[in-house]
Amino acid sequence: MAEIELHDEIEAWLDSLSQDDWERIVVIIDRLAALGSTARMPFSRSLGEGVFELRFTLGRTARRVTYRFTKDGRIILLTTFRKQRDNERHEVARAKRAADACAVDYP
């Protein structure tokens, strides 16, 4: 099982969730930890440049959590966003910037 680490944005988002949503996300994150790099669609999708997204819904809202792998196999959860067609390109670019920024702390 892969070790999961949380970027500041993910920590803040998790703290803002209701108990029910938090418990649901923990199950999703645990599944990612168990699957590691073998996670595939529809659960996970590559965004390119070593960044991936978890795909899930909370209530009736499609959400994404972006992540990357470190050289030693840890998974760093980077950003989160509500899935909308209009914002995907911007959110993918933001996730890639977060991955680049945290590569110093999590090589």
Label each region the model flagged.
Residues 1-62, 71-75, 81-107:
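Basic, Lys/Arg-enriched alpha-helical interface segments
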